[in-house]
C-alpha cells in the first residue's frame, strides 16, 4: 500500500495544471472536427534550430484527450495527456525533456492527437479538440500557433 501511494504521488508530481503556467503558445485545432467525438488530428511543424550545446530543452504539452509525439521520426511520447478535471476548463500538461531528439538545423515535430469527446473515469471533456505545445529555450521558441500544419 505504501509503495502504491508513493508511486501515485510521483506520477502526480510530473503532471501540472495549465493555469499554473504563463503560456505563449495558442490552442490549435482542426476546423473539420473541433467537437466531433472520437476524432484523430495530426499536427506538424518544421523548425530550424541553433546549436543546443549545454542546454536542456523541455516542451510543455496539453491536449484533450491523448497524444503521441514524434521528433525527427523518433517517438518521444506514447499516449501522453488524458488527465482533465474536475471542471471542463481544467487542463493538465506534460513537461517533456526533448533535448536528445533535437538537432542543430532542420527539425520535424509531429503530434497525433486523439479527442475522446466525452467524459471518462478521470477525464472531464473540454468540449473541443485541441493541442497546446510550448517549448521555450535559449535562442528559440517552438509554440503551437497558426503556422502548424
Predicted regions and their residues:
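Aromatic-lined ligand-binding clefts that engage carbohydrates, nucleic acids, or primary amines
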Residues: 53-70, 109-111
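Extracellular beta-rich ligand/substrate-recognition surface
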Residues: 31-41, 82-91
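A short, structured loop/turn motif at beta-sheet edges
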Residues: 54, 99-108, 136-142
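Beta-strand-rich ligand-recognition modules
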Residues: 68-125
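Sec/Tat signal peptide C-region and signal peptidase I cleavage site
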Residues: 16-20
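An acidic-aromatic loop/edge-strand motif
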Residues: 21-33, 110-149
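Sec-dependent N-terminal signal peptides
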Residues: 5-14
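Short beta-strands within extracellular/lumenal beta-sheet-rich domains
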Residues: 37-49, 91-98
Amino acid at each position: 500500500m505504501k509503495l502504491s501511494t508513493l508511486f501515485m504521488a510521483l506520477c502526480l508530481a510530473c503532471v501540472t495544471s495549465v493555469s499554473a503556467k504563463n503560456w505563449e503558445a495558442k490552442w490549435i485545432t482542426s476546423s473539420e472536427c473541433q467537437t466531433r467525438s472520437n476524432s484523430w488530428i495530426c499536427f506538424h511543424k518544421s523548425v530550424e534550430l541553433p546549436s543546443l550545446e549545454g542546454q536542456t530543452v523541455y516542451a510543455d504539452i496539453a491536449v484533450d484527450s491523448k497524444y503521441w509525439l514524434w521528433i525527427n521520426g523518433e517517438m518521444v511520447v506514447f499516449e501522453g495527456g488524458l488527465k482533465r478535471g474536475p471542471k471542463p476548463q481544467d487542463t493538465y500538461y506534460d513537461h517533456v525533456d526533448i533535448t536528445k531528439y533535437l538537432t542543430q538545423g532542420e527539425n520535424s515535430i509531429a503530434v497525433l492527437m486523439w479527442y475522446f469527446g466525452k467524459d471518462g473515469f478521470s477525464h472531464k471533456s473540454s468540449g473541443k479538440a485541441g493541442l497546446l505545445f510550448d517549448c521555450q529555450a535559449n535562442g528559440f521558441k517552438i509554440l503551437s500557433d497558426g503556422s502548424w500544419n
